[in-house]
């Protein structure tokens, strides 16, 4: 029986843990929280007391004699995953690739070398440097982005004519969210946002789905919903797919899932970033199999174990979407209307708050 090592056992990792058990694999999970929901579902649960500690987690992988490692829907321990693959000669990305795929500056450099479609991007030295670059080298609005972070945390739009004091506040926020304390300033692409869900096997990227995204407005662009399949014209979808494939090749991805984020401006696709893992927000774990009929979770598990994935539809195809309902900031008084969640068109629903909780502002 093959052993799969899952880094993380939170809500977003639970579908992967369940699927791997269903597929007959022995599943080991490591999470610093012993009460993480996936810890009770695995064959063996380990609390490493430092999931990002390469030496500690590598020692666990060696001791358990694992056959593959996966870090679904998260980037926190991607370097650890790459190191394990290198040391144990396993399927999946190398540490070098993991570093490139989790550092947005190195990612932009890789896109530029390969010719993958990418907006103008400059690594800043500090807040004053960023302001000068914005004033002197950008004739359009721009984006401040943490060099190392996943999701939308720390990302903010900066607009021409805004006060320097406001710019400085947004810069400091991006800096605080960056794990390497570096911030990029990038050309702002005016247009709709998408993601492309991909499985890379033996160096070849295979597109499974194109996702239409719904976000909040500037400055933070927090993701509030996702729709599959895309309703955009076929020509636009082809450009998105081509951009995603070029980006995966530019990063040197191999034997992994990929979540590729792009925008369209004036008919042209631009890569925002690529994660060398399944997408969060239940895009890869739920939406993709509902819309495409392809079991992306099973495919990602198999490529991590060095097994050829089944990329043919095995289920009926549906239109599917997910929405995150975010009340205004403040104290939550009551939750009403939950009866609608029992309707036939609702595949799944979760409520993460309860009356009395404090609802924060939507900025990440």
Region locations from a protein language model:
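Glycine-rich phosphate-binding loop signature in dinucleotide/nucleotide-binding domains
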Residues: 60-66, 136-139, 179
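A conserved helix-loop-beta module that forms one wall/lid of the active-site cleft
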Residues: 86-154
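Internal nucleotide-binding/catalytic subdomain
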Residues: 155-269, 278
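Active-site "cap" helix and flanking loop/linker of ATP-utilizing ligase/carboxylase catalytic domains
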Residues: 239-260, 265-266, 275-333
